[in-house]
Amino acid sequence: MARTTYKETALDEGDQLEIVHFIGGGDRSDPQPADDPFTVAGRVFSSRLLVGTGKYRDFEETARAIEASGAEIVTVAVRRVNVSDPSQPMLVDYVDPAKYTYLPNTAGCFTADEAVRTLRLAREAGGWSLVKLEVLGDQRTLYPNMAETFLAAEALIRDGFEVMVYCADDPIAAKRLEDMGCVAIMPLGSLIGSGLGIINPYTIRLIKESVSVPVLVDAGVGTASDAAVAMELGCDGVLMNTAIAQAKDPVRMARAMRLAIEAGRLSYQAGRMPRKLYADPSSPLAGLI
């Protein structure tokens, strides 16, 4: 139901009412240089690091880690409100939607219908049209179900959503999603929460070369060097959650990730030296004593 129709809509016998809010799912100082902004769906950001809000010990730690990361976009999951205990803390009390861009996601959805319904609820609850779509294949791998992802993306785009999409590291699928109208392609580096890093850097690079919309590595980052590798491959950004939230010191790891993203981006822009089979001395031989 659209918010604009609330006043004139009456509940009938047997109707069910769902009240939802946003939960953790998935330092604004020292951002990326102003001359190298990250742009998605016409929105401009300083930071190329996107962070999830789940798996932390509490909301206080969540807020401190996000602040240290420098991220401006935070992913949130949509869940039913516990109306029996309204005193329970809520994410919005700690992570201000006026300060950060909330990116509602479909974490936990295994069908296109579930994903579409979840994001429609998110739009009604918060008014957000920029969303992250993920349709999972099974509980064991949380690998993307691409058939259902295509169906959900088509329905959401038709409904006016701007879709950032979690997908397999498949350049053909990525191109199809771009052609459908997705505003960002988000291939997994490795399985969600695995910390295995980027298993197939070659296919990530192929995806980057195949599409013109932003490409962000989503899932699998375990430590700062993984984030730097993603950026050195030419990716436009990285989304992560577990690597920060499950670190021994999440706030310190968040800062490490911020620096890794910046270092990887600068390295990509600078261009690495060519690989050589044999040695090449740094000091000139002319004038050797």
From Swiss-Prot:
Kindly give the Pfam families that the UniProt entry links to this protein: ThiG (PF05690)
- Mainly localized where? cytoplasm
Q: State a GO cellular component annotated for this protein.
A: cytoplasm
Q: What class of enzyme is it?
A: transferase
Entry EC number(s): 2.8.1.10
Q: What are the entry keywords? A: Cytoplasm, Schiff base, Thiamine biosynthesis, Transferase
Compartment(s) where it occurs, according to its Swiss-Prot or TrEMBL record: Cytoplasm
A single GO BP: thiamine diphosphate biosynthetic process
Q: What chemistry does it catalyse, as a reaction equation? A: [ThiS sulfur-carrier protein]-C-terminal-Gly-aminoethanethioate + 2-iminoacetate + 1-deoxy-D-xylulose 5-phosphate = [ThiS sulfur-carrier protein]-C-terminal Gly-Gly + 2-[(2R,5Z)-2-carboxy-4-methylthiazol-5(2H)-ylidene]ethyl phosphate + 2 H2O + H(+)
Spell out the catalytic residues: K132
Write down the PANTHER family for this protein, in alphabetical order: THIAZOLE SYNTHASE
Per the record, the similarity remark reads: Belongs to the ThiG family.
Q: What does this protein do?
A: Catalyzes the rearrangement of 1-deoxy-D-xylulose 5-phosphate (DXP) to produce the thiazole phosphate moiety of thiamine. Sulfur is provided by the thiocarboxylate moiety of the carrier protein ThiS. In vitro, sulfur can be provided by H(2)S.
Kindly provide the name given to this protein in its UniProt entry.
Thiazole synthase
- What organism is listed for this UniProt entry? Rhodospirillum rubrum (strain ATCC 11170 / ATH 1.1.1 / DSM 467 / LMG 4362 / NCIMB 8255 / S1)
